[in-house]
């Protein structure tokens, strides 16, 4: 499985997880530039939630959350600002969903990163 398919599979898992938690998926893979992509845009109650998804096969080389660098977070924030400039949104936050697939599937939801 190539990296794009692997990433999409992780995002599919994250969407199913969010939906089970009562989130409505609004958009996926919203691109604003080469460096600025929002993986999942969802709504939970009255809050729009921008979700960065990180998926790893194992945690042998570190946990998925470690891949959310300062630069990555800055790019996510830029994407959020673009989205907010196009849409009327009162309440929002940025979350991360970190998925490790082996030895068993583990999903960690980090809110307000």
Name every feature range the model reports, one short phrase each.
Residues 1-28:
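Acidic-basic catalytic patches of nuclease active cores, encompassing PD-(D/E)XK
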Residues 55-103:
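Catalytic cores of nucleic-acid endonucleases
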